[in-house]
C-alpha cells in the first residue's frame, strides 16, 4: 500500500494540509496521478472553490471512479466533503461523485452574513474515532456558503442560521 495522498483537485491549499500531516509525523504527497491515487493507503480530498471546477478537474484526470470505488479511508475537507454527495446547487447545479445520497444546498442563514466565515462549534452525540481527544462543542473554522443537510450520515452538527452537517461518514468516506 502507498502513503497518504492529498488529492490535487486544482482548487485548494494543499501545502498547508501537507505541512500539518508531516508535522504529525506522517508521510504524504500531493498528486492527481490515477495510478498513485488508487494505490494510496489513505486519501485526503481538500477543496476550496466550486463544485463545478473540482468535478471538471477530477473527471478530466479520470479520478471520479477511482474515488467512488476506493475502499481505504478517504477524508473530504470542505468542498471535498460536498463532492462526496450526489448533487450541488452551486453553479446552477452540478452532478457530484454520489457516494452520499444527499444534495449540497445553499446555506439559508436568516439574515446572517454569507459566506459563513469564522469559528463555530460542532456538536456530536456519536462516539467516533474521528473525534478522539476532541471535546464535544469544540470550535472549528468555517468558510462556506453551501451545506450538507443533516441526514443519516451526519456525525456532527453546526448551526449558522440553520443546522447543517459539519461532519459526515458513510463507510470509509469521512468529512
Curated annotation (Swiss-Prot):
Signal peptide: none
Main location: cytoplasm
GO molecular function: glutaminase activity; imidazoleglycerol-phosphate synthase activity; lyase activity
UniProt entry keywords in alphabetical sequence: Amino-acid biosynthesis, Cytoplasm, Glutamine amidotransferase, Histidine biosynthesis, Hydrolase, Lyase
Compartment(s) where it occurs, according to its Swiss-Prot or TrEMBL record: Cytoplasm
Entry EC no(s): 4.3.2.10, 3.5.1.2
Reaction equations catalysed: 5-[(5-phospho-1-deoxy-D-ribulos-1-ylimino)methylamino]-1-(5-phospho-beta-D-ribosyl)imidazole-4-carboxamide + L-glutamine = D-erythro-1-(imidazol-4-yl)glycerol 3-phosphate + 5-amino-1-(5-phospho-beta-D-ribosyl)imidazole-4-carboxamide + L-glutamate + H(+); L-glutamine + H2O = L-glutamate + NH4(+)
Domain of life, source organism: Bacteria
Gene3D superfamilies, per the entry: 3.40.50.880
Catalytic machinery residues: 78 (nucleophile)
Any one annotated GO CC term: cytoplasm
S-S pairs: none
Record SUPFAM superfamilies: Class I glutamine amidotransferase-like
Pfam family, one: GATase
BP term (GO), one: L-histidine biosynthetic process
Annotated Glutamine amidotransferase type-1 domain residues: 3-175
Function summary: IGPS catalyzes the conversion of PRFAR and glutamine to IGP, AICAR and glutamate. The HisH subunit catalyzes the hydrolysis of glutamine to glutamate and ammonia as part of the synthesis of IGP and AICAR. The resulting ammonia molecule is channeled to the active site of HisF.
Entries under PANTHER family matching the protein: IMIDAZOLE GLYCEROL PHOSPHATE SYNTHASE SUBUNIT HISH
Protein name in the entry: Imidazole glycerol phosphate synthase subunit HisH
Gene name of the encoded protein: hisH
